[in-house]
């Protein structure tokens, strides 16, 4: 296929429109398997040519309410079909192949077909591609004699791979699954990349993604890190890492770490050094090539284009000879297959079978993946995306529940048996007498697997039926850890393992991690520890371990440890029911089970004890804290008491104590000193780090918070407190009763599922697990405070649970980070909170919350979670990354989970991570994550921003008086929270609206949706702003609201407030039930920075109705609560009841207000969205914003307004979206607001006013009207991005030099006095019209082969072929493809380097002074220039230079105030909507008036916007009006309480961004969501 163009550029949006393959292609035998379907040998029936046909199931499901077809942009487009996740990936792969397969290193794509099947069967999608007869690189390596390719062949293949990747990366596509199986070879040694099922377009801001996807062994560290830390991101350089791993695969026959389980490999890749080839027979160039490819920090890793210049792939000697020799080798492989009768396959038959059941997995980093998770998938860090595939090969087949439970308990017995064997083994085994001490210690702690395979089955364990289900989960969690211990250095312990089994273990081939291992899924399956080659009988023997073998394998080292660990009466008699199962269950069940969670102090995850410099292993301090192997076992066994004494001890005890046993164990694990021999530290590093990671996964209190509360004995028992205590006792009884029920294993298998453990998630209280055996004193005499009495062993081994309230202690880390923590309590003014441990629902909700990005890990740690630790002499406190769910950057922490401030056990809420069009953008240096003392306030980029924390004392006093709240004022302003009572509203919890790339309209003349509307083309990142009306366009506009009137409304009797809050959080009735809210209780909320509130306190919603609406509005405005019943609240105004005041950073106090429920009208108005999240604000840290998690109901039509908390000290004049982030131009600076997760404000350009800005991402340009002379300046986006990311002095110096030499910024023709500009992208040319005081200048960025005369006519010459396609991204593709194909030197140049700026024409405007200008293609396919003036609207033909006036309604007494020229996206670029005064009309570009007055605004709007859902929005003096373009009716009106200036900035999809100017000339940014496109299409004929 020669190149792009024509059908390639039209994106496939409806699979049903593809042709039928019958009569064109026929299928032969199966030759391979792709990600989602089989690959067949296809035969073109007319020519007899062979092809590869990928056949996949595809089904379309009609939505009943909008299951119809409509006409959009001349094309029939289905709006009534919704595709599944798998089918969306198929469409992605199909469109990527259509666009980019013209490259010689991408498999050629011949077409796609849709084969209809009979009713009841799924239809089939056929993708016909080039046949690569030699198979994949993996197959070629396996068919080679020594399973290794020659170095020259590797260099050639790597070069071809890099060329294909450079082609994809130039088009902003990340492959994300480069491996040997996805690199195919033809019979003549051509290299082709295949399998684009997981490829993705990168972010438009800085080209990054953060979804967790790929094949584990080839996965780059930054991709793995995105699963553990979604604040991270990666870019196309992750493919370069995969190329390096593929090179190792070609050199050694398998990728590194292929002998590990996939999850283990993920841990090792992220934490170990970069892999390399083991053999030393390779050249230095090859080693250097792999080192460059596998640089762990992707910011320093070369790109694919740079790697092509590496000598290893650039200087291939005798390339022709290399290709010929490789061709001969491939021909021999093909003939060898034919001789052996092996069919032409791309992968081995076993791999086909495995990959058919084992598919890729994805972590929940992408919001659209999280939304589809079932409710039973609670707290799974990794999930299967596509359906429920068959079990992977490391899991056995499902068996009967009784048999499976038996195997699970036997697995648990093997895990904990080493400790039991210590009590009963009389002497060490003779064969192990010579074994080093470390091997014996390892054998005790991790029972080797192979030692059990040949073990003689003596008597099966008898206690499995009586053990609680959590024990089986503990066994499943620890099984992979047990599998890790298979290593060559334990051969003396593993003498029973046959060489055949070892060979099978070593040669187990790599696999896609297509399904999550069982311990992360919570499914009731036993992890299969044997590799795929083992026989079923060996697996059966593996599940039954005799007690004698266990005793023989455990050699006691110190008798005193045995004596301390022995049970007086039961140690010898419990061989059948090992006591270690019961005892250690107390330790590992709370830590490791999936459904039973006990809080671990934060310092175990955020601090490790590291020996101070100069401290050696031999020093007394270090020796005192270094465990010998028996002591390590003792520490594990000491975890029993450690939980009850250390972790769950009363946090209000003020005496400091030595490090507890669990802290000691974690300290040793964290410092990689589990054994005392320092020379073995490197060898054990991977295993210990893997163990540490697995423990941290289970120990990390991701979904829970430690909350402080009053001691009950210190309180007077009021009615509310008495109710709470009764509820507490009731839940204690339920908890213990449910504990007894859980231990009945003989019930149905469903007892093992999460349904049986719902109470564990719904109970909020501190759990105290009482030990069932006396505490074994620590060998090093580490003192541990006794908290709960020891209980002798009983037959049932019940874990009794007590509920108590306690006050956590300040920790060392809390004191160290005092300036950073915003809620830490001073020791003098420590306040306590009331316990609120109640729950009224047993319904589980999936934990889908993820943390937001771009935040240093220690910026907002909740210090209340920390428990005191004692740091011994000679140690310092080191830091590692904290768990995400313990930081306030996590979205979920700012909302529902905060209601459980007083609880240790807290169910996590249903909260989605921030997402903007599926792309995450990270705008901070990755090295900032490692800084431990990040005080984000010390950043001079926030000069014009500050947190709104002023002048709230009076407001607080008013709230205190209105609510009768007894409050203890401190230095800081205290905050209150309104608790919204949702029991009256039965709105279901709705899934989040998938706005994404539904479209963006044209602003500023920059086309987002001309011609073929961008709303339906999937490219939604073209955004721009329009500055309306001239230099004083919005000077007379009014402001939004004032604190005095607002405070009066807050004091209404129907609102409740509480002391330690910020803004109220609204929940659905389902979520409220899960949290146990009722009308008698008010719960404290602490909200995060970012969106200060849904801004409903400034805007009131008015729905047009015959009467009643205005009265309700007046009632709200006057501060009186409306008396309408609750069911009428949807027809009333909305007003928020929360305050603007900051909450206290040092203390909190309970409130005794009588108004417990918030305004019902406000709740009703917001509840349609399902959930509106108001994160927490902080005066100490940059704001964290969560703008996207809106769950919009399909029935909702009311707009939502959200406000960003940051205020700007100068007026915001313009804005434009750059990717997901917002560029804001003020009267003094240019800022970037990071909307990806935190509302960080970065100052990009100082001391220069900006009047209008617009981002042109395809051209890598930012066009501005800026400066005091209103010059037209063009900035390079690359320079701005480097200004954000690179803060080192050398980079800053380089940036200043670029600015001086006009490499970063250039003034176009030194034009001054610019009023407005507009951009139109069409084909290869980008036009820009600039309005000056008396003329309009027309410029164009065109290919360097164009001149002025060609550029002005290119529209006419090519419009007939384009059929109205003005998609700028398609033009960008054409620019690259055509210009780069013409000259290979241009292959990797940026688009702006391939174009030149042409000055086309200057059009005098005679006596008309232009105010706004716009560009369009007229009905005669000619370029038209619209501009407005005080005299009306005018039209200029660009080619003939003829100017004419647009007909307006004649009213000689009226002065025309022009606002906007809006290109209507559904009119193929011909239709215009002209807005002026309080009217709007639509005209065609051929001067014909085809509609009369379209709309009549109630007031003259300052600015008007048109968005993709066919609605116009006007910002007037008194209200914001939303009108339908089709029905011409006023859909909604949001009134403002006081006058503020409003100015429209930009739009994306149905999100409209605008700004308001406050009375003190400060500005604030809002965005408004109007509703879903599908809902409007069901109501209007779009």
Curated annotation (Swiss-Prot):
Which residues are connected by disulfide bridges in this protein?
none
Q: Which annotated residues bind ATP?
A: 31-39, 54
What ranges does the record list as Polar residues composition bias?
A: 803-814, 825-834, 850-859, 1136-1154
Q: Which parts of this chain are annotated as the region Disordered?
A: 492-579, 783-859, 926-1156
InterPro entries referenced in this protein's UniProt entry, alphabetically: CNH_dom, Kinase-like_dom_sf, Prot_kinase_dom, Protein_kinase_ATP_BS, Ser/Thr_kinase_AS, STE20_Ser-Thr_kinase
Per the UniProt entry, the effect of residue 424 to C is: In a breast infiltrating ductal carcinoma sample; somatic mutation
Q: Which residue windows are coiled coil?
A: 725-759
Residue ranges with Basic and acidic residues bias: 965-978, 999-1016, 1043-1061, 1125-1135
In-chain residues carrying the UniProt-annotated modification Phosphoserine: 852, 855, 1027, 1031, 1034
State the EC number(s). Answer: 2.7.11.1
Location of the CNH domain: 1209-1552
Residues of the active site = 177 (proton acceptor)
SMART domains, alphabetized: CNH (SM00036), S_TKc (SM00220)
Alphabetic keyword roster = ATP-binding, Coiled coil, Kinase, Nucleotide-binding, Phosphoprotein, Serine/threonine-protein kinase, Transferase
Q: Does the keyword Glycoprotein apply?
A: no
Please state which protein family the record places this protein in: Belongs to the protein kinase superfamily. STE Ser/Thr protein kinase family. STE20 subfamily.
Q: What is this protein called?
A: Nik-related protein kinase
The organism that produces this protein has a lineage beginning with: Eukaryota, Metazoa, Chordata, Craniata, Vertebrata
């Amino acid at each position: 296929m020669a190149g792009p163009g024509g059908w390639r550029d039209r994106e496939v949006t409806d699979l049903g429109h593809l042709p039928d393959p019958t009569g064109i292609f026929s299928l032969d035998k199966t030759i391979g398997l792709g990600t989602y379907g089989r690959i067949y040998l296809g035969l073109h029936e007319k020519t007899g040519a062979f092809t590869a046909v990928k056949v996949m199931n595809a089904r379309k499901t009609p939505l009943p309410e909008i299951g119809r077809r409509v006409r959009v942009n001349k094309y029939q487009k289905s709006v009534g079909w919704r595709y599944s996740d798998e089918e969306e990936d198929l469409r992605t792969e199909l469109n990527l192949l259509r666009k980019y397969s013209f490259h010689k290193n991408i498999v050629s794509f011949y077409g796609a077909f849709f084969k209809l099947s009979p009713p009841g069967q799924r239809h089939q999608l056929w993708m016909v591609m080039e046949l690569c007869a030699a198979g994949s690189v993996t197959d070629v390596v396996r068919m080679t004699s020594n399973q290794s390719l020659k170095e020259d062949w590797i260099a050639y293949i790597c070069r071809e791979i890099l060329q294909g990747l450079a082609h994809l990366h130039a088009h902003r596509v990340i492959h994300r699954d480069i491996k040997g199986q996805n690199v195919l070879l033809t019979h003549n040694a051509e290299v082709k990349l295949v399998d684009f099922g997981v490829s993705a377009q990168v972010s438009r801001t800085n080209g990054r993604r953060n979804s967790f996807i790929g094949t584990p062994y080839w996965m780059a560290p930054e991709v793995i890190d995105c699963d553990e830390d979604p604040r991270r991101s990666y870019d196309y350089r992750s493919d370069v890492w995969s190329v390096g791993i593929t090179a190792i695969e070609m050199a050694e026959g398998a990728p590194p770490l292929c002998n590990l389980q996939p999850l283990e490999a993920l841990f090792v890749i992220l934490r170990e050094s970069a892999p390399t080839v083991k053999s030393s027979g390779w050249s230095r160039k090859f080693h250097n090539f792999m080192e460059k490819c596998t640089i762990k920090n992707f910011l320093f890793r070369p790109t694919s284009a740079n790697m092509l210049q590496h000598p290893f792939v650039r200087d291939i000697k005798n390339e022709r000879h290399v290709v010929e020799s490789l061709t001969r080798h491939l021909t021999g492989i093909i003939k060898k297959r034919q001789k052996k009768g092996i069919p032409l396959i791309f992968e081995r038959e076993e791999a086909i079978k495995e990959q058919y059941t084992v598919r890729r997995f994805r972590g929940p980093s992408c919001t659209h993946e999280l939304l589809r998770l079932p409710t039973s998938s609670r707290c799974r860090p990794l999930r299967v995306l596509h359906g429920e595939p068959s079990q992977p090969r490391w899991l056995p087949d499902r068996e009967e529940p009784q048999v499976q439970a038996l195997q699970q308990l036997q697995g648990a017995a093997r895990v904990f048996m080493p400790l039991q064997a210590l009590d009963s083994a009389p002497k060490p085994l003779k064969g192990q007498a010579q074994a080093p001490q470390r091997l014996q210690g390892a054998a005790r702690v991790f029972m080797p697997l192979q030692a059990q395979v040949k073990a003689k089955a003596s008597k099966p364990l008898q206690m499995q039926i009586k053990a609680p289900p959590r024990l089986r989960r503990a066994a499943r969690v620890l099984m992979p850890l047990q599998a890790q211990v298979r290593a060559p250095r334990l051969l003396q312990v593993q003498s029973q393992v046959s060489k055949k089994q070892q060979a099978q273990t070593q040669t187990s081939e790599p696999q896609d991690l297509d399904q999550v291992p069982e311990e992360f899924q919570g499914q009731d399956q036993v992890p299969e520890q044997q590799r795929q080659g083992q026989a079923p009988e060996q697996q059966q023997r593996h599940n039954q371990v005799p007690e004698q073998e266990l005793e023989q394998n455990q050699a006691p080292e110190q008798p005193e440890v045995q004596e301390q660990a022995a049970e007086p009466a039961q140690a010898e008699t419990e061989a059948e029911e090992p006591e270690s199962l019961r005892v250690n269950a107390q330790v590992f069940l709370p830590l490791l089970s999936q459904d039973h969670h006990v809080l671990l102090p934060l310092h175990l995850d955020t601090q490790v004890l590291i020996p101070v410099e100069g401290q050696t292993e031999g020093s007394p301090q270090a020796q005192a804290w270094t465990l010998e192997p028996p002591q390590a076992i003792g520490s594990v066994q000491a975890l029993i008491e450690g939980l009850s004494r250390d972790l769950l001890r009363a946090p209000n005890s003020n005496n400091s104590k030595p490090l507890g046993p669990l802290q000691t164990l974690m300290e040793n694990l964290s410092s990689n000193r589990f054994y005392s021999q320092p020379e073995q530290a490197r060898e054990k590093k991977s295993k210990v780090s893997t163990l540490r990671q697995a423990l941290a996964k289970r120990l990390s209190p991701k979904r829970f918070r430690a909350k402080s509360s009053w001691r009950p004995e210190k309180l007077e028992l009021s009615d509310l407190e008495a109710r709470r205590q009764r509820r507490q006792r009731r839940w204690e009884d339920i908890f213990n009763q449910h504990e007894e029920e859980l231990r009945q294993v003989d019930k149905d298998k469903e007892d093992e599922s999460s349904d049986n453990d719902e109470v564990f998630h719904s109970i909020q209280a501190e759990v105290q697990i009482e030990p069932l055996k006396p505490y074994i004193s620590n060998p090093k005499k580490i003192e541990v405070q006794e908290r709960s009495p020891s209980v002798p062993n009983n037959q049932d081994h019940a874990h009794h649970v007590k509920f108590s309230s306690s006050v956590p202690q300040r920790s060392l880390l809390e004191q160290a980070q005092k300036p950073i923590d915003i809620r830490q309590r001073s020791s003098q003014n420590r306040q306590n909170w009331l316990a609120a441990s109640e729950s009224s629902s047993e319904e589980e909700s999936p934990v889908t919350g993820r943390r937001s990005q771009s935040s240093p890990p220690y910026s907002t740690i909740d210090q209340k979670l920390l428990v005191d630790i004692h740091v011994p002499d000679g140690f310092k406190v080191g830091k590692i990354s904290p768990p995400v769910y313990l930081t306030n950057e996590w979205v979920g922490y700012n909302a529902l989970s905060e209601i459980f401030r007083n609880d240790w056990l807290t169910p996590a809420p249903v909260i989605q991570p921030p997402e903007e069009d599926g792309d995450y953008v990270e705008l901070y240096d990755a090295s900032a994550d490692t800084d431990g003392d990040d005080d984000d306030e010390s950043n001079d980029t926030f000069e014009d921003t500050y947190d709104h924390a002023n002048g709230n004392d009076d407001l607080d006093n008013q709230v205190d008086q209105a609510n009768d709240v007894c409050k203890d004022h401190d230095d800081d302003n205290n905050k209150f929270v309104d608790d919204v009572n949702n029991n009256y509203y039965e709105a279901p919890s709705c899934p989040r609206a998938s706005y994404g790339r539904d479209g963006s309209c044209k602003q500023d003349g920059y086309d987002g949706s001309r011609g073929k509307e961008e709303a339906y083309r999937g490219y939604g990142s073209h955004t721009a702003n329009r500055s309306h009306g001239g230099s004083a366009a919005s000077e007379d506009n009014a402001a939004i609201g004032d604190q005095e009137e607002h405070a009066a409304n807050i004091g209404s009797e129907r609102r409740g407030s509480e002391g330690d809050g910020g803004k109220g959080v609204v929940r659905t009735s389902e979520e409220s039930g899960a949290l146990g809210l009722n009308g008698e209780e008010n719960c404290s909320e602490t909200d995060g920075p970012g969106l200060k509130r849904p801004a409903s306190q400034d805007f009131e919603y008015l729905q047009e109705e015959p009467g009643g609406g205005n009265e309700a509005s007046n009632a709200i405005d006057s501060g009186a609560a409306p008396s309408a019943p609750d069911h009428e609240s949807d027809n009333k105004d909305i007003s928020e009841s929360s305050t603007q005041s900051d909450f206290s950073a040092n203390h909190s106090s309970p409130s005794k207000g009588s108004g417990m429920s918030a305004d019902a009208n406000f709740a009703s108005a917001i509840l349609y969205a399902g959930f509106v999240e108001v994160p927490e604000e902080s005066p100490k840290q940059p704001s964290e914003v969560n703008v996207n998690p809106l769950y919009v109901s399909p029935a909702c039509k009311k707009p939502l307004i959200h406000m960003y908390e940051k205020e700007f000290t100068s007026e915001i004049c313009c804005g434009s979206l750059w990717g997901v982030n917002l560029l804001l131009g003020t009267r003094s600076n240019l800022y970037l607001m990071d909307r990806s997760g935190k509302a960080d404000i970065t100052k990009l350009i100082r001391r220069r006013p900006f009047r209008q800005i617009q981002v042109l991402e395809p051209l890598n340009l930012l066009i501005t009207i800026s400066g005091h002379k209103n010059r037209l300046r063009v900035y390079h986006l690359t320079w701005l991005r480097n200004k954000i990311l690179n803060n080192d002095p050398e980079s800053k110096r380089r940036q200043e030099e670029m600015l001086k030499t006009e490499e970063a910024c250039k003034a176009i023709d030194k034009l001054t006095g610019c009023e407005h500009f507009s951009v139109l992208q069409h084909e290869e040319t980008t036009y820009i019209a600039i309005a000056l005081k008396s003329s309009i200048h027309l410029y164009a960025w065109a290919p360097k082969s164009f001149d002025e005369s060609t550029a002005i006519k290119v529209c006419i010459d090519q419009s007939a072929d384009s059929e109205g396609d003005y998609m700028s991204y398609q033009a960008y593709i054409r620019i690259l493809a055509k210009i780069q194909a013409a000259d290979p030197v241009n292959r990797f140049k940026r688009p702006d380097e391939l174009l030149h700026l042409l000055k086309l024409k200057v059009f005098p405007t005679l006596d008309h002074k232009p105010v706004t200008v716009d560009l369009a293609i007229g009905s005669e396919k000619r370029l038209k220039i619209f501009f407005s003036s005080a005299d009306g609207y005018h039209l200029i033909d660009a080619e003939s230079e003829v100017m004419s006036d647009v007909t307006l309604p004649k009213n000689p007494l009226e002065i025309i105030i022009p606002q906007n020229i809006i290109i209507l996206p559904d009119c193929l670029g011909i239709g215009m909507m002209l807005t002026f005064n309080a009217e709007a009309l639509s005209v065609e570009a051929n001067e014909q008036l085809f509609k009369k007055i379209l709309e009549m605004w109630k007031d003259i709007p300052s600015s008007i916007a048109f968005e993709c859902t066919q609605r116009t929005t006007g910002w007037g003096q008194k209200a914001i009006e939303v009108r339908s373009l089709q029905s011409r009716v006023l859909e909604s009106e949001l009134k403002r309480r006081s006058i503020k200036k409003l100015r429209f900035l930009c739009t994306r999809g149905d999100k409209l961004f605008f700004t308001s100017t406050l009375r003190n000339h400060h500005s604030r940014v809002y965005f408004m969501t109007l509703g879903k496109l599908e809902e409007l299409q069901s109501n209007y004929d779009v």
